[in-house]
A protein has these predicted regions:
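Extended interfacial segments that mediate partner engagement and assembly in macromolecular machines
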Residues: 59-70, 79-190, 210
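Phospho-regulated, low-complexity intrinsically disordered regions of nuclear gene-regulatory
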Residues: 550-571
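Terminal RNA-binding accessory module
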Residues: 1-74, 111, 373, 381
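Short, charged amphipathic recognition helices of the HTH superfamily
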Residues: 499-510, 521-522, 536
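Rossmann-like S-adenosyl-L-methionine
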Residues: 2-7, 13-17, 223-497, 505
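Internal alpha/beta scaffold segment
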Residues: 157-201, 222-254
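DNA-recognition alpha helix
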Residues: 504-516, 526-532
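Short Lys/Arg-enriched helix C-cap and helix-to-coil transition segments
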Residues: 536-549
Length: 571
């Protein structure tokens, strides 16, 4: 299959992240994103690497039997919701299946590795759950009228005005419509990403789920030729505040951003009305949030996530952390740290984003917590500087996971238990392999769905340091005579019972090349080992390769691999 090939296939399964495996009539497998199991799709191959083909979705020819829900009007054009046509219970089943496969491919199944996979907790709200949106200004087609919404799927320039978006509530939709109507009526140009000319860039909207407080931040350039900015912004404020809302307006802001990059960046913010912040509540604690604060976008889902983590940490003994020090690494605005502070001696949070650390300190004071300490800096460097050692470690890293060197330093503390909260299962699977190789075992895993209708999912893992099941005390006397062990026999016995040298994939490949004169791929060795019922988890890269469409080894190579396995006494 070559680049540019246009074909059809039926989606056999979907692997995380959102990678559908479409099977053609000829049995070829192609990765096609944004698909659902059971769909018949048309695709165009746009990438071929290592005999693995990836295609761009052109059309869904036949719907999946799973698709029984009516989508919002923007489904298919907007790049936001992939699973909106699938009933919610089936959505979370799909996510659970994807994460289970990733984890079992990386560290083994529940039975093989001895952990418990509890399942998945759904979001309390299935729609209108988001507390934050970043809308972009632009047009829906070249030189079209002003649009305000989300980027079209697969497009850098074109937008979709998501006036009926179903993952936010009516207040968001009212704000979007009021803003678009106002600036359209005044003929204000948007910032063109190609020419870097124009005024309107983004509209950031946040609404607290518990308190109902709303803040809106209009992000623009400083290019004000042709209109009076002060009068324009006064009119914008009036257009917003004269509408009806279920919530209450806490602030209207204006942020300037002349950066070329198409991101929401703060180069100076002024308050047009009210305050520059609002308050949200989680599990009895209060949090002050600004337009640019990091905070989970699903408040009720966040409560489920953090409650799951807290249950993993405390278990059946709610006093287990009394008098102990907890490290919250990659602590963000300190949400988890503050939830754990009442049940331990001290919580030390480490976060690289300085603004988030300032917010964490302010929120801890707001909640009357004086045993929280937050440090701004890279976890990799800060761990070398902290003198007090932790009794427990909580990990909540960004999407890319934990740097291998940082994992090494974390493991050196030798804490009995850790909890790892992950927003990207592929990074989690990779990191768990390292923890297990270094003496930790996975005890429990649970997924939490924070993002209904999308493919994203959070995962919570409890890790514990491996310990002996029991101990036997034996008194041994060395020397000559009855009941004693001769000293000179110890070396002989040690040599006789010395563990066999670990047989690596590299050794197998070198043996085959030397004897047969050809090379074999690591994934081929893993495939043969799998067929023979042998463990493969000592070679994560090989296991990862097995998940991708690849030709099978020839019978000649299979026999060569088996010969090598016999030579090294593996079989």
């Amino acid at each position: 299959m070559k680049k540019g090939f246009r074909g059809t296939g039926t989606v056999e399964r979907v692997d995380f992240p959102n990678k559908g495996i479409a099977v053609t009539d000829d049995g070829d497998r192609v990765i096609v994103k944004n698909t659902i199991p059971g769909q018949k799709v048309e695709f165009v191959v746009n990438k071929v690497k290592h005999q693995r083909a990836e295609g761009r979705l052109m059309e869904v020819i036949e719907k999946s039997p799973l698709e029984t829900e009516e989508p919002c009007p923007h489904f298919g054009m907007c790049g936001g919701c992939t699973y909106q046509t699938v009933p919610y219970e089936k959505q979370i089943d799909m996510k659970l299946t994807q994460v289970k496969k990733l984890i079992s491919d990386a560290i083994g199944t529940e039975k093989e590795a001895g952990y418990e996979f509890i399942g998945i907790h759904g979001s309390p709200k299935k729609s209108e759950y988001r507390n934050k949106m970043e809308f972009s200004f632009g047009d829906e087609y070249k030189d079209g009228p002003l649009a305000l919404g989300m980027h079209k799927r697969g497009s850098f320039y074109d937008l979709v005005t998501v006036s009926d978006c179903q993952i936010v509530d009516e207040d968001f939709r009212t704000i979007l419509k009021a803003t678009l109507d106002y600036f359209s009526k005044n003929n204000i140009p948007y910032f063109h990403r190609a020419t870097h000319k124009g005024y309107l860039r983004h509209l950031l909207v946040r609404k607290a789920t518990k308190t109902g407080e709303i803040i809106v931040d209009l992000v623009t350039t400083t290019q004000t030729e042709g209109f009076n900015e002060e009068e324009l912004l006064a009119g914008f404020r009036y257009a917003l505040l004269t509408r009806h809302y279920d919530g209450s307006f806490k602030g209207v802001l204006h942020t300037k951003n002349d950066s070329v990059a198409d991101v929401v960046k703060n180069e100076g913010t002024e308050v047009l009305y009210g305050d520059s912040y609002f308050y949200e509540e989680l599990l009895g604690l209060k949090f002050k949030i600004t337009p640019f604060s990091f905070f989970q976008t699903n408040s009720l889902g966040a409560e489920v996530l953090y409650e799951t983590a807290r249950e993993f940490i405390l278990g059946d003994d709610k006093d287990s952390l009394n008098g102990k020090t907890v490290y919250d690494l990659y602590s963000g605005t300190g949400t988890i740290a503050q939830l754990m502070a009442p049940v331990c001696k001290e919580v030390v949070g480490v976060e690289i984003v300085e603004e988030a650390v300032c917010a964490a300190k302010e929120n801890a004071t707001l909640n009357g917590l004086d045993n929280c300490k937050f440090i701004a800096g890279d976890v990799l460097k800060v761990l070398d500087e902290i003198e007090e050692k932790p009794d427990y470690i909580i990990l909540d890293p960004p999407r890319d996971g934990i740097h291998p060197k940082a994992i090494g330093k974390i493991i050196e503390y030798g804490v009995e238990n850790m909890v790892y909260i992950s927003c990207k299962p592929t990074s989690l699977a990779r990191d768990l392999q390292i923890f297990m190789d270094r003496g930790y075992r996975v005890e429990k895993i649970c997924c939490v769905d924070m993002f209904p209708n999308t493919y994203h999912v959070e995962t919570v893992v409890l890790l514990s340091h491996k310990k002996a099941d029991s101990y036997i005390h034996i008194d041994v006397e060395f020397g000559e005579g009855e009941g004693k062990i001769p000293v000179d026999s110890i070396a002989k016995r040690a040599e006789a019972y010395k563990p066999k040298e670990k047989v690596t994939y590299k050794m197998i490949k070198e043996y085959i090349e030397a004897k047969y004169g050809f090379k074999v791929h690591t994934a081929y060795i893993a495939e043969v080992k799998r067929d023979l019922g042998l463990p493969m988890y000592d070679a994560p890269n090989a296991v990862e390769e097995l998940k991708q469409p690849k030709k099978h080894p020839t019978p000649e190579k299979v026999e060569a691999i088996k010969d090598a396995l016999r030579y090294f006494a593996v079989i």
